[in-house]
Amino acid sequence: MRLVVAAVGRVKDKPLRAAMDEYLGRIRRYVACDEIEIQDGPPAKVGPLLARASAGASVIAMEVGGKALGSEAFAAGVERWGSRGKGVVAFLIGGADGLPPDVSAAADDRWSLSPLTFPHRLARLVLIEQLYRAMTLLRGEPYAH
């Protein structure tokens, strides 16, 4: 399995970037995981870049209105989507205005991290942490805080 986190916007905040890098490193002990930052812009520009970043993958659009999943169901979903096709699962996070409608419509599934609205950079950290948690759950390992 390979995971891709494609997100609109750059993370410039050093502590936030450090936390993301910590969890990405932990995920990579289990599976390959790429993070792709896409420059923010109008939907006509962002949409094709997100599509290219997720080409050939099972695509999960991360949206407030998506399916709300607990950590166990999230892990099971990662495993299910990761076992299909090429074994690549791409998680897409939009910018301040969310994902372009055509990108959302083309996704294989839509998940939500919470009914709360998060700044997109914080949502990325929460997603990456949940991907690490999913890896530990799938292997029956205790979660390392």
Swiss-Prot record:
The keyword S-adenosyl-L-methionine applies. One of its GO terms (molecular function) is rRNA (pseudouridine-N3-)-methyltransferase activity. It is found in: Cytoplasm. It catalyses: pseudouridine(1915) in 23S rRNA + S-adenosyl-L-methionine = N(3)-methylpseudouridine(1915) in 23S rRNA + S-adenosyl-L-homocysteine + H(+). Belongs to the RNA methyltransferase RlmH family. Homodimer. This is Ribosomal RNA large subunit methyltransferase H. The gene is rlmH.
